[in-house]
Amino acid sequence: MKTSRAFRIFMMGLDLIVMFFLRLFKKFTRLRTFDHHIGTRVVNNTEETSPEKMGIVSKLEVDGQETDSYERKDPVYVSDASYSEYEGIVTFRGNHRRNGYSYGRMSSKKNHLNIDWTVDTVRLQKGYGKGFWTGSGWTGQPLIVRWTEDQKKRMNIYSTKKEEDLTEVIYSTMDGKVYFLDIEDGSFTRDVIDVGLPFKGSGAIHPSLPLLHLGPGDSGPKKEDYARAYIYNLENQKKLFEYGGKDPFSIRSFCGFDSSPLFFNDYIFEPSENGLIYSFKLNAHYEDDELTIAPDEFVKLQYHTYRSSEKKYWLGMEDSPVVWENYLYIADNGGTLLCIDMNTMKIIWAQDVVDDTNGSPVLSIEEGHPYLYIGTSLHWSPSRYLRLGYCPFFKIDALNGEYVWIRDYYCNTIAGISGGVQSSPILGENDIKDLIIFPVARTPSVMDGKLVALDIHTGKEIWSTHMKNYAWSSPVVSYDEAGNSLIVQCDSGGMMHLIRGVDGKIIDSLSLGANIEATPAMMGDRIVVGTRGQKIYGVSIR
């Protein structure tokens, strides 16, 4: 429902007063635990997580033909080995478990944030109304790669940059452009790619080949500017393939590609906001010394639940999938978390996660058993008029989809600016081992929020740090050689905070001047992130 700016401001003021008085007698957080028994190490549904309980009806299309079943020609099985052959951050949150928040170690005894460089971006007209897409949006994480000398020789990187020890930042932003920058000083390493569609989500680089996947979050103002996904050759910046636009197999009319895909066995897996999950074989090869692809085995999974509609509990996925063995896990705008066998594209189990789920899950292996941690925004479930309600954060058994525990936070939301959890959590290591850390927006008041750390085993809140401005940006963490953690958390007020992981104490803050919805990428002591204020920042910890 569209509302005027004046009405939204009035409601925010009213909610501010209501939430102030509610704090006098209402619990703003609560914990629910469930009887959970670890069974056999087999992925399967239970009575509570059967797809039929969510009213799921699914269809498959393979190479343009609807089919009842499918078996992948080259089966996928993901080991515990590193996801990427590159040094750097090649997908949202770094890898297939979405726990690769940074690359390399930071230096010890450094605790101050410093702006090293900035790069201006521009704006792009929206496909509806009179507004513009500006800066870097949600999730908006840059990619960072340190190329080898041989790789640089094959690329159209500027000759002066080929002579240096180059670490390249590749950043797709909401002005429809892809920027290629030197992480040291922000200087351009090659020409900008101008696609002309807004990139709200995060791109992805193939983990062993110089291929770049781009997914716009919306269409443009012209008829031909419809949203679809792209694959580019990073050696020469040529577009190799596009897919997903105006797909007749889709149930939902809207289309976008905020999700950051994963690549395995020459296959790509990409969920879309049109409600489809795409998978196809790249058949990547060199032809006349030039990298190209010849996609085939093109598979689309379509489904809907008993509550799916164009008006509420939408189909479509904005989060990025995680993978364990041959299973893909993804949540959707309609509050459904799915486990899918990647080799049959069959939905194995489905769990109700209540509300619009935008933050990506993180996968944790605990004593050999896989678990998922994921939170939701407050979109469909708040009270009708004041838009208040509990927003859940879940620990879920990845084998059968059953709840282990749920931690709720009481939040506010307004049209277009959701409260709750929009981010993806940190799964701690070293000195923050056994902690799951994430921000909650619009609690305990309208414009503020908190960063919280929970015990992964019990859901108990270990620490909570108040934030004067709420955060959609996902936190990143890095460790020094001794295993001491520092967290970087950006917020809607344009602040970047440096936070001690063990107790949540803010030890430094830095203003970047405008709302930071995007998630930073971190390599060593260097951090890169864009703001809605049409700037990309290079920041270092000193």
Over which residues does each language-model region extend?
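Extracytoplasmic/lumenal domain signature
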Residues: S4-V78, N99-W138, L143-L214, D218-F257, ...
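Predominantly extracellular/luminal regions of secreted and cell-surface proteins
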Residues: Y83-M106
